[in-house]
Amino acid sequence: MFGSMQAVYRIESKYIIDSEENYCSTFGSKLHVTARYEKERDNYTFIINRSAVLLNGKPAVKLMDRIMSEVGNSLYPIHLRVSPRLWILDILNFNEIKQRRQQCADDWKAEADSPELERYFRFSEKNSANGKTLIASLYRDTFFNLYFRDIFTPTGNDEARLIRWQNFPERETDQSYLYQVKPEDADRIRLSGEIMKIVPEHNGTFDTVYETGDQGEIRRIKGRIESESEGTRYMKQWTLETETGQIAKQGYKSLILNE
């Protein structure tokens, strides 16, 4: 039976409009992940912490970036209950997180005040109103949207799954993609598909490769989404990989299959 898993990941995501020369921004951080199987519940507990947050390769400097970074960091550590197929079911320390976020917001409100800041805090409070809304907000984050997803169950030839990318191609917009899960070999799984044609003039693709270790543990996730509309091309790229020697031998796939 699965005992535990520990890993340290470094993630970097890059947002590009038309080309890197036109507009490009990057976000990076370290994610510290611990997981254990709970036999009596037949699910898993994940504890996630975050450090070394960088915007365009540097710590946040602008006031709004600093506020968003600190409010984002108040989410951690986060304790998740996760289903056997890797979907997030519950946030076990929700009340603790809500108190941290409120304290962070109160501290900044006492120091700075602006209409933009008020809008941001209203949005943040709405996202953390209850466990369900906070889980939904987690899936707006690249790491959670890719990591907590059933990648070990292949799709059939006529089957497609849905992934939604929020704040893409632009802030306060979202796009959905239908994709298939195809194992390429023993340690590579590809998720690929196309944008849902809700808006006919939008075109786009989703392509991501997961690389796993000997035990099936996730070692690397590398991929991108693209969208094109009215001659403008938007792209988001990401790379998530473990730091050398920082993942347990008992692996992630074993955690899923050893039910």
Label the predicted regions.
Residues I88-S192:
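Solvent-exposed helix/loop surface patches that form functional interfaces
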